[in-house]
């Protein structure tokens, strides 16, 4: 039978299993011999056990498991030897003896184990033995075996390295300098072995080797952790000895993987205070790293860490003598210069980190933030970038960069102080400019930032011009209507934040805003001009409030209404009708209420403009009814007209109502007109209501006549009920022309017609309306109000 091929994983498991079994057998024998005090035999079994670490067949992961199993067993040997030496056994002989082990791997592991026990028993030998051990380990140059051997050396000597604060005879026991030299040498040798791994084996296994190297990196990094744990390593020693030694090794190894990992390791394991004192050498080293190293990530990690340190409430902050921002700014520029092929998005990422640093460490220094933006503009100019596509990585990073000042200051006026914010904004393509403009305006609205001067209005409008005017690079096809409406509504809401405490300044602000919005095209102005008109009306009311302090207030009001008139006229030119009609009516009301010199003429002009729009521009019957109802309602509220002006306007309303196309619309509009002759007011009667009962009756009779002409029975009855309600209203207002007899006749007419209607949901509604009307009359008849009319003789 042919044997089945094993997978590499199964092969590894089998090899590891066999090695572990051998370790168990040899360690069992070693322990038996130790229990019988047969030390030489025990060392022979230990040597056999360690012989398993000579293999080249295991993967790093499997080798690590084997190494851990053997380390545990060696610990047993170390404890035994420590006890023996405490009882007076000679260590020196043993230290000499294990050097005769046949193979170098077992020999060095045993030497380290015995050497550590020797140092614990005779501290005066520490300096020589440590030096001896770290040098002897050079005997193993196979990368995997050498790395684990040196890791064993580092772990075993962890508690015996000389450090600060312990009584020592420096000649023999060594001091902190010896510890630093020991770990730095071990680190350098381990790094060389680790780097050399990539050159072993066939080139087709390169990816696999890189993965294995990634798995082993922590062994090299442990040296740096060990250095950071030495209490004797203060800022001065770190600067002069430790960092210099590490950086020399990192830069000289010319291996991208090692450089990137070790630089990040330095940032992580040493304290922030050390980094602050060694920024320049560290960042200079960054500029010298291999071209394939992602320097951006290293620098960003350091910046972010120091920014957090500066921001800590319980921390000491950044010392005044350390110009943190300047150092990073200069060194980042050097790094970018040294890497011509650095991707644009990485360059911008570095600026993002710099701006974060400026914001967190120097919140008051707007100039630092602007310096970062200026540098970015210069870089883009060199790269000849323009209209950066929304989908690109550069655009995403640039968006991050520009959002930081917006989000941190939460005040657009501070952002406007950044001279290079707008120039950088212009590098975006149309889509990105639009979305960033929305982002900026949303921030203004969220934080209610008031814009108080013309210059500020100009600056913001220019910044977000993509939302306000057509752009040369905008797409040919029309935007999505919903999105467009959302964007323009944002702009419309923003207008309400254009407000100065000084009314004259406010007028200039509105004028400036109109210049920008006026160029927005027909699609935009329907959203942007109405709020501007309302802001103008509000300003006129402010002048009225301040009339005691400003003797020219009336002329200024006239100017404002002229401004509003021009602005509304722009909407008419854009072929809009209903919107300008409403704005004219609102203006007429405002002018009448404020009562400045000439206000009647202004109000009359605004009313007649509304009429012209109604007659010339509105053709849809539904829209016509809505418009004439609005005109009548507005006019009824006004009390600034003399009879000379009031009479033609109310007559015009009645005429327009009777000319509507559809009979039901005519009936409703004419009955609404009745109110003008009752509660309308003019100056001739000192603002009192007209109470023209006869004219009211004429309107209501005309409405009934029109209702009679309707062909649809349901609609006819519905109109009768509506007109009945009008009659009741005027009867209760004590209009003598409306009598109980009139009410009885109309109720009787409705009662006769209702049963003839076809059964439907609509008929049900009509019945309900009529029933509610009768209920109202019944309750009034049964409990008459003391001042109200008496419903005597009403037939229900």
Swiss-Prot record:
One of its GO terms (molecular function) is D1 dopamine receptor binding. The keyword Secreted does not apply. The modification Phosphoserine is found at residues 7, 783. The modification Phosphotyrosine is found at residue 791. It holds the Pfam family Vps35. GO terms for biological process: endocytic recycling; lysosome organization; mitochondrial fragmentation involved in apoptotic process; mitochondrion to lysosome vesicle-mediated transport; modulation of chemical synaptic transmission; negative regulation of gene expression; negative regulation of inflammatory response; negative regulation of late endosome to lysosome transport. Residues 500-693 are annotated as: Interaction with IGF2R cytoplasmic domain. Keywords: Cytoplasm, Endosome, Membrane, Phosphoprotein, Protein transport, Transport. Its main location: cytoplasm. It is a peripheral membrane protein. Acts as a component of the retromer cargo-selective complex (CSC). The CSC is believed to be the core functional component of retromer or respective retromer complex variants acting to prevent missorting of selected transmembrane cargo proteins into the lysosomal degradation pathway. The recruitment of the CSC to the endosomal membrane involves RAB7A and SNX3. This is Vacuolar protein sorting-associated protein 35. It comes from Mus musculus. The gene is Vps35.
